[in-house]
Amino acid sequence: MQRRTMIMNYRMVSQSAVALALFVVSASAFAAENPHAAMMLKCAGVCADCQVTCDSCFHHCASLVGEGKKEHAKCMHLCVDCAECCKLCATLCARQSDFSAIAADCCAKCCDDCAAACEKIADDKQMAACAKSCRDMAKMMK
């Protein structure tokens, strides 16, 4: 039952990321005329990519925790928090919300923490990819 719920949640997250990506693509014509809008849309796209990477790493860590590898639990929690922050930031940036700067600060902090946790577990390609995505995201937000 727990695996079924996890799969359903993963599908919902993937669908929301696809919807956001389509929104970003459709808004590109407007962005071509407005440099600020172009930057906001670029940020939204990078946020959406990081969200997908963090959600994937969350799933990876959840599987490992299920196998008894408890050292992945903290990373698992940080990945899901980071994915949510990235999702919020992507949405607000795509809308060019006045609150996007606040979301970007929160996103940078979450990404830094997530990257640090993923980097602690060596020799795991999934976690290395998540750490890189988060580091790149945090750098862009600062």
Predicted regions and their residues:
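Intrinsically disordered, low-complexity terminal tails/loops enriched in metal-binding residues
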Residues: Q2-S14, F23-K142
